[in-house]
């Protein structure tokens, strides 16, 4: 969870703090390693940011390979999940304006707590895909290529 969401009541115990504004805490690699080695279920957002409106459609930015690499290191299988929902037009407009102006700071992130509270009471569709055995992700593709393949399968759910 980003540093803003971690400060909301009840959110801190649910996530690993990822600092999107300043430097990362020294213990972040250890916290991630502990999470991957635990028996707890966890959600990973491979794009690192909320989805954006691209060509008129809400979609993720390119996914990173870290979730594949860590799953491979720890023997954790992957369950693809598609969460159908969207933030406000205001959120996407600010994200687009930020990109258009070439601003590095993620201004849209500042809206996430408000976006979360505005969605209270809404119903969302969550679809779970078939588990992907980490053993099935052989060396025929790089971890990055496997990440993109799983991303594509999530969008087909």
Which role does the model predict for each range below?
Residues 1-23:
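Catalytic core of membrane glycerolipid acyltransferases/transacylases, capturing the structured
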Residues 26-157:
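Non-catalytic C-terminal accessory region of glycerolipid acyltransferases
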